[in-house]
Amino acid sequence: MKLTDYVKQVSLEDFGRPFIHHVQWNRRLRSTGGRFFPKDGHLDFNPKVYQELGLDVFRKIVRHELCHYHLYFQGKGYQHKDRDFKELLKAVDGLRFVPSLPNSNSKPIKLYRCQSCQQRYQRKRRIDTQRYRCGLCRGKLLLVNQPED
């Protein structure tokens, strides 16, 4: 898929306005589907969203970024908080938030339990049980589950 041609097509079909700036993939985007840069008008998109969630979700993200784009160049409110943005986003059926991506490098949760009061602690990082104690009763902590690394 040629990204620039696709964004131009979505802009004409859904907004009735041409897109005349630059579009590019940005692999460094983590928690967002795309970004609009008002300074020069270009758009960045997260390729993982397209690969993992498919074309339907990606089209809605393109619509979201094009809402920012077209409203900015019309001199209207283009930020998420602005009424113009919210109304246009709803009219073109764009996504407000990106659905979460399957994260392959997320850390497994470690579960610790106090031996005295049975208080549970969930942590992504290891706790030194020789050094740290329960925050409620000062009892010893015990690692309950050891996730596979």
UniProtKB/Swiss-Prot annotation:
Metal-binding among keywords: yes
Cofactor notes: Binds 1 zinc ion.
Coiled coil: none
SMART domains found in the cross-reference section: SprT (SM00731)
InterPro entries: SprT-like_domain, SprT_Zn_ribbon, Uncharacterised_SprT-like
Cofactor(s) required, per the database record: Zn(2+)
Keywords per UniProt: Cytoplasm, Metal-binding, Zinc
Organism domain of life: Bacteria
CC annotations in GO: cytoplasm
Active site: E65
Record domain SprT-like: where: 4-144
Compartments, record wording: Cytoplasm
KW Ribonucleoprotein (keyword) present: no
Predominant location: cytoplasm
Binding locations of Zn(2+): H64, H68
GO MF term list: zinc ion binding
Single biological process term from Gene Ontology: response to stress
Family, per entry: Belongs to the SprT family.
Descriptive protein name: Protein SprT-like
Provenance organism: Streptococcus pneumoniae serotype 4 (strain ATCC BAA-334 / TIGR4)
